[in-house]
Curated annotation (Swiss-Prot):
Name of the featured protein: Secretory carrier-associated membrane protein 1
Compartments where found: Golgi apparatus, trans-Golgi network membrane; Recycling endosome membrane
Gene Ontology biological process terms, A to Z: endocytosis; establishment of localization in cell; exocytosis; post-Golgi vesicle-mediated transport; protein transport
One Gene Ontology MF term: protein domain specific binding
Modified-residue entries (N-acetylserine), positions: S2
Source organism of the structure: Homo sapiens
């Protein structure tokens, strides 16, 4: 009956103990169960039952980003490797030099026992004339000078071949112009003259200078080689009636016959190359000469020592002295008689 006596317009939850604000606040903070989970509710609501979601593994490949600065141990390892490589290189160089010195020492011992046998020019054994010089770069020339001496030897050979080709160039020019007989004859003379003279007058002094560190032979080489360079320049110029297929003669021959002119131009280019290479090698040899400690005073001393130790000079001096003494004695004896 009490329900009928209540006010129909009153709040029905007024007397409900479960609608009390303190109770509803506590029940609201409790996470809903699985049956009450609403997927469309606020995303900030934690998963039902307080279940922790498993971590999703990262499917991207693991890539290490290179660092700009290497670790300290890497730098130390690199420096150690470089130092070890440098030591190995020096050791190999020292072993190579030691082997070269041992080989030269053995060869010198063999030469001292059996004597030096001339081996240049390399002529056949049945040839009526034998070799005139002994030449062995590995035995006579120090290692640091062998390359330079070999280049000078190749330069001499190059000039000899150019002189030989010059004969054929002048012969071809003589075939198209009979007035060039003088050039053809002189070309043969230059080949027969300059080939042996250049070998004896400047190459052998250079070879001996580096072999025995002789200042006097260096000065002989410089004097003769300057003259040789002047000859190269004149041959490259090619004046008429000089026996050279230089540029002047080549242009004249080109006007007369094109094939002959082309042949002469090639020879003129070879003469020019000889002149240029000669100048370059002269500067190189002069630079090496300054590093050897040679000087003009040493050259004078070597010349005086060589002259005084020469048996021919000693014999001539003794004969001159005896002749002067005998003539002086005779003059004195005649003066006493008078």
């Amino acid at each position: 009956m009490s329900d009928f006596d209540s006010n129909p317009f009153a709040d029905p939850d007024l007397n409900n103990p479960f609608k009390d604000p303190s109770v509803t606040q506590v029940t609201r903070n409790v996470p809903p169960g699985l049956d009450e989970y609403n997927p469309f509710s606020d995303s900030r609501t934690p998963p039902p039952g307080g279940v922790k979601m498993p971590n999703v593994p990262n499917t991207q490949p693991a890539i290490m980003k290179p660092t700009e600065e290497h670790p300290a141990y890497t730098q130390i390892a690199k420096e150690h490797a470089l130092a070890q490589a440098e030591l190995l290189k020096r050791q190999e160089e020292l072993e190579r030099k030691a082997a070269e010195l041992d080989r030269r020492e053995r060869e010198m011992q063999n030469l001292s026992q059996h004597g030096r046998k001339n081996n240049w020019p390399p002529l056949p054994s049945n040839f009526p004339v034998g070799p005139c010089f002994y030449q062995d770069f590995s035995v006579d020339i120090p290692v640091e000078f062998q390359k330079t001496v070999k280049l000078m030897y190749y330069l001499w050979m190059f000039h000899a071949v150019t002189l030989f080709l010059n004969i054929f160039g002048c012969l071809a020019w003589f075939c198209v112009d009979s007035a060039r007989a003088v050039d053809f004859g002189l070309s043969i003379l230059w080949f027969l003259l300059f080939t042996p003279c250049s070998f004896v007058c400047w190459y052998r002094p250079l070879y001996g200078a580096f072999r025995s560190d002789s200042s006097f032979r260096f000065f002989v080489f410089f004097f003769v080689y300057i003259c040789q360079f002047a000859v190269h320049v004149l041959q490259a110029a090619g004046f008429h009636n000089w026996g050279n297929c230089g540029w002047i003669s080549s242009l004249t021959g080109l006007n007369q016959n094109i094939p002959v002119g082309i042949m002469m131009i090639i020879i003129a280019a070879l003469f020019t190359a000889s002149a240029v290479i000669s100048l370059v090698m002269f500067k190189k040899v002069h630079g090496l000469y300054r590093t050897t400690g040679a000087s003009f005073e040493k050259a004078q001393q070597e010349f005086a020592t060589g002259v005084m130790s020469n048996k021919t000079v000693q014999t001539a001096a003794a004969n001159a002295a005896s002749t002067a003494a005998s003539s002086a004695a005779q003059n004195a004896f005649k003066g006493n008689q008078i």
